[in-house]
């Protein structure tokens, strides 16, 4: 697994400019401390850390990628959250669909293109299941079912 966890995927290097990231307290970004984050100030890119550690949740993300990650989570989480024990199976399915090792099948390690692919795969799976699901606000043009309709 070590060989696939590059400095970019570990949040140590900015994927936009190639500079080393800086470890700071998240209060500099959010006004409240949620723990440490890695940041590239030049690119306004940052990523949080696992609770109580300085291990990043993935790659640094600029505004576009942060939005893409939120959107991917919005759809993927609807596949497993109704039944929490499905999380591992959902991520194993996603790993197979993306053709990447399970160990790096994390939205936090994804780029914009991969986040969009994850959202698309999750939407397809939700439609396949025939369940109502909530759409992301900017996806209003999608012809998909909205929860409660």
Feature-to-residue mapping (PLM):
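Long C-terminal interaction/binding lobes of large macromolecular proteins
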Residues: 123-149
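Alpha-helical context
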Residues: 44, 48, 52-56, 70, ...
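Extended interfacial segments that mediate partner engagement and assembly in macromolecular machines
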Residues: 54-96, 105
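A general structural-boundary detector
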Residues: 1-4, 27-30, 59, 81, ...
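Glycine-centered loop/turn motif at secondary-structure junctions
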Residues: 18, 44, 83, 98-102
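Short, compact, well-ordered microdomains
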Residues: 90-125, 129
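N-terminal cysteine/histidine-rich coordination modules
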Residues: 1-54
């Amino acid at each position: 697994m070590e060989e696939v966890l590059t400095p970019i995927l570990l949040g140590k290097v900015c994927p936009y400019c190639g500079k080393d990231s800086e470890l700071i307290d998240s209060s500099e970004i959010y006004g409240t401390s949620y723990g440490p984050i890695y940041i590239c100030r030049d690119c306004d890119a940052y990523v949080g850390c696992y609770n109580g550690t300085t291990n990043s949740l993935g790659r640094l993300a600029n505004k576009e990628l942060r939005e893409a990650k939120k959107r991917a989570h919005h759809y993927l989480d609807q596949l497993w959250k109704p039944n929490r024990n499905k999380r591992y199976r959902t991520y194993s399915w996603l790993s197979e669909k993306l053709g990447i090792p399970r160990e790096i099948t994390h939205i936090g390690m994804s780029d914009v293109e991969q986040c969009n692919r994850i959202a698309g795969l999750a939407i397809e799976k939700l439609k396949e299941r025939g369940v109502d699901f909530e759409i992301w606000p900017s996806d209003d043009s999608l012809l998909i079912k909205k929860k409660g309709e």
